[in-house]
Amino acid sequence: MTRYDAVEAASYRVAREISLTGLSSWRDAVAPYFRPGSTVLDLGAGTGLFVRAFAEWFPDVTVVAVEPSAAMRSASGLPMLAGHAEAIPLPDASVDVVWMSTVVHHVRDLTAAGAELRRVLRPGGVVVLRSLFRERHSGIGLFRFFPEAARALSSFPTVAEVADGLGFAVDRLEAVPQVTASSLAEKASSVRWEADTLLRSLSPDEFSAGRARLLAAAAVETGPVVDHLDLLVLITVGGV
């Protein structure tokens, strides 16, 4: 999994974190899996956006955060374990849900990660992903201003590649809306080249041109920025 340095971690927190109000559709989407008394592993927890969200949304759920980057763990200010998808520092059969938000495209060995997921999941447990997939990106407004960023999609897996690579079956797939920013002006103020896999594929000139397009649109357009990421729920093959 990708590791971030201290500068990137700080930029990530500025550029990528979204208000809990903006994520309310995600609360509703995952609620069926976050049952009272369950244990959730936030795998690749970053700077802790969803650790905080789950604590507020589901106070009867225990969340364990694992993050490979020391800089991200430090920036979060939260208790987190060092680890990654291919080496999860938890006992066998210890969690009911594995949550992975914008993480799976960073996983280098899906087969090894799948074995680890099955190891730590209890019987009947699920893997819940919030992600962008190569063939499902029309709901991301970033491409309107930074069209060249689409070339980075070649490094993102498809839904089938994720399910097959991890060795799980698809139980649910749907696009979930989120208010990424209250306005294009807010989005423009927080966009960071170093904080986004898609933007990191751009040259300095491409990034500058895209930011100029974003600023020009922000000067005349009002209203919230709404993007759609996919909810993918995976179950063990045969549902065991």
Describe each region flagged by the PLM.
Residues M1-R35, L49-A53, W57, M72, V126-S154, ...:
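Conserved class I S-adenosyl-L-methionine
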Residues S19, T47, R172-V240:
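Conserved Class I S-adenosyl-L-methionine
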Residues L41-L43, T47-A87:
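Class I SAM-dependent methyltransferase SAM/SAH-binding core
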Residues W99:
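A conserved beta-strand element that flanks and buttresses the S-adenosyl-L-methionine
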Residues T102-H106:
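Short catalytic micro-motifs in class I SAM-dependent methyltransferases
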Residues T111-P123:
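A short glycine-rich, Lys/Arg-flanked "PGG" loop and its adjoining helix->strand segment in the class I
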Residues L153-G167:
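Short alpha-helix
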